[in-house]
Amino acid sequence: MQSNRFQRRRALIQAGSAIAGAAALGVPMHAFAQAKGIKIGFVSPQTGPLAPFGEADNFVIAQMNKLFAGGIDIGGKKVAVTIIQKDSQSSPNRAGEVANDLILKEKVDLMLVSSTPETTNPVSDACELNEIPCISTVAPWQPWFFGRNGDPAKGFNWTYHIFWGLEDVIANFLAGWKSVPTNKKVGGLFPNDGDGNAWGDKDRGFPGPLAKEGFTLLDPGRFQNMNNDFSAQIAAFKKDNIEIVTGVVIPPDAKTFLTQAKQQGFKPKVVTLGKALLFPGAIEALGDLGDGLSSEVWWSPSHPFTSSLTRQSAKQLAESYESATKRQWTQPIGFAHALFEVAVDALKRTKD
């Protein structure tokens, strides 16, 4: 049985080819034809401060369970698919624990993981160590790759990633800032986590590209997530006459910073934050503080794509979510759905 499981794991990565900038996985036919079915593990934050990232996951998994009810075609044969979902609780330690449970206890054949390096990285590391193929998303590729001590000359053997990079978000932020008259002085809010360390990195993050475009970046240093006092950062920004604030913070920290900035009389012309402002609920929680803020948009109902699984357009997928949940669409819907598109496409293109 262990031999069969290893064969199935190894099979999943043998015929890799690029899909949307990420390596897709290939699976030999005979391994699954003889198997009782495929187990897919899915890890994301359902609770804790990162929970908004996982808000749409139950909806997407319900869609997939319905779609997979009769199995999927692999080489003309129907193969049963089971999805086992786990909550990272917004904790890197917990993410690693549930990944190991899925690998060692549930015996999953393929792992899918989404939402921030604090989730994707420990799950990917567990899969790399245990030789389980893994596809991850919703974390810029730099903190996922270099945050795991990746070597560009070697890459990884079992773990694959689909998402944009810091070069993309920096270019978009800069384009927006150039449209507003400012003194080009930028204050950075970079926490001591995978995203913050990558975004603030002098070689791979914001400092270099901003300097090349004539912007100066003041980085007052790292802080812990769930910070309750941003007085030091606000004082530094005021002293340096900062007119643009950027960074990558969790929703609770954005609210704390914006509240304290208002209380302390700091009024930047532009506030562009990654991560914290992606979700309708997070903006609603800010009240009037949410007016005039900006952030990146990496999926929306207006994106011109159609699902390879359900044939829904992005607009139809968003409408389906809103109808089922009575909540406004949220960006991670598209990438949670895309994880399953890549997984199924790879499985359907298997070879003996």
Regions found by a protein language model. Give the residues of each.
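Beta-alpha junction/loop-to-helix N-cap segments that form part of ligand/metal-binding clefts
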Residues: P52-F59, G71-G147, F223-F230, K255
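Extracytoplasmic ligand/sensor domains, especially the bilobed periplasmic-binding protein
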Residues: V108-G221, V271-S295
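Extracellular/periplasmic bilobal clamshell ligand-binding domains
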Residues: F230, N241, E341-D352
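Extracytoplasmic "Venus flytrap"
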Residues: G41-M64, K86-P92, S115-T116, L189-D201, ...
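C-terminal segment of N-terminal export signals and the immediately downstream linker at the start
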Residues: N4, V27-P45
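Stable alpha-helical elements in mature extracytoplasmic
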Residues: P49, F53-V60, M64, A95-A99, ...
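Extracellular/periplasmic periplasmic-binding protein-like sensory domains
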Residues: W141, A261-H337, R349-T350
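N-terminal secretory signal peptides and thylakoid transit peptides that target proteins
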Residues: M1-A20, V27
